[in-house]
Regions:
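Non-catalytic beta/alpha edge segments that cap or flank active sites
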Residues: 1-190
Length: 190
């Protein structure tokens, strides 16, 4: 039986955390991951306001106490004054992984020119990969799954193609994926 993967989901939004409207980020992430990941998954969820200290505290708790293998944040990555998720992430990680943010912007630019305003990033804390995602459900699915052509073939790989191998490299569980959703790339060993 495959290893259980512990995934933290953090939605950062003043309005959703204040009950003004329902959060859409966490349900979208859970639905996408349920299709993509074949391992048993235990989700740990948090809805927090756009307060850097609160975001940092939640990321630390999930990585250190809850022992998450992977944490996704949604929202708070734009240029608005209250968008502080990247700053919170960079304050808690030990290694920045800038390729994730670069790839997210590349994917999103296929769909909207304002993707260039995104400040998404990623990094490693202990044995946990933390990745900032957009807040909108459609953008979450696009960045994780990538860009596909009319024939269904991959034009630009999504982030999730690299995540299982990254988790391998930092000592986490072996993540198996449904290749029709997101094929995990692992280099062949000679």
């Amino acid at each position: 039986m495959p290893d259980t993967v512990i995934i933290g989901l953090v939605s950062t939004s003043d309005r959703a955390s204040g009950g003004i409207y329902p959060d859409e980020g966490i349900p979208s992430l859970k639905a996408w991951l349920a299709k993509a990941v074949r391992n048993p998954v235990r989700f740990i969820e948090a809805l927090v306001p756009d307060e850097q200290a609160e975001i940092e505290a939640e990321l630390k708790k999930m990585a250190d106490s809850d022992r998450c293998d992977l944490i996704f944040t949604t929202g708070g990555t734009g240029p608005a004054p209250r968008d502080v998720t990247p700053e919170a992430t960079l304050n808690v990680v030990e290694k920045e992984m800038p390729g994730f943010g670069e790839q997210m912007r590349q994917i999103s630019l296929y769909y909207v020119p304002t993707a260039i305003l995104s400040r998404q990033t990623a990094g490693i804390r202990g044995k946990c990969l933390i990745v900032n995602l957009p807040g909108r459900p459609k953008a979450i699915a696009e960045t994780l799954g990538g860009v596909r052509g009319e024939d269904g073939g991959i034009k630009v790989h999504g982030l999730f193609s690299a995540i299982p191998y990254c988790i391998d490299l930092i000592g986490g569980p072996f993540i198996e994926t449904d290749e029709t959703v997101s094929k995990a790339f692992r280099p062949q060993r000679k």
